Amino acid sequence: AIARLLWDCGRQDPFADPPGDWPARLAPLATDADLPPLSRAMATIPLLALHVPHSFQADQPTRRAVAATLLRQNAALLVARRPAGPVHRPLREAWRPGGAGFAELVRAALVLCADHELNVSAFAARVVASTGAHLHATVCAGLAALSGPRHGGATARAYALVEGARESTDTERFIAQRWRPG
């Protein structure tokens, strides 16, 4: 419902049709849980574009339907699953199967992230979109920016710092060494 509101869909529901399964040649890549999620998405999404007409040359309802499918596919790529239903469901099934309450927490987090100002990845995606590029190329630009160590990559670095500090016998010394210049 939030995407429909942000996309100004009116009565159209671009999520009405099920997203379908992965194309046969892409299924092994899209569901390879040994690949890091961002790498899996960056490798698969450009190839998915081969199966979709140029999204910016289509009418508005078609563009929204392409975007809805791509949104579901992107979520499925995050957890190496097949695209399905609302975006929060495959995430819940991968992270905490059967956790209905957890599903609502995931959905709420996604709602909070839906319109989150202009960060680096959103800016990169908007620049690419402004050229009339395929929607899949636009998403790839955002993901490429997200992969940088000063944007999405910072999360992995922060997690490693917290884990290292938790495992250290001298937390203050560990953090001081990590933050020392050079």
Segments and roles (model prediction):
Residues 1-182:
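Hydrophobic alpha-helical bundle cores within soluble ligand-binding/oligomerization subdomains
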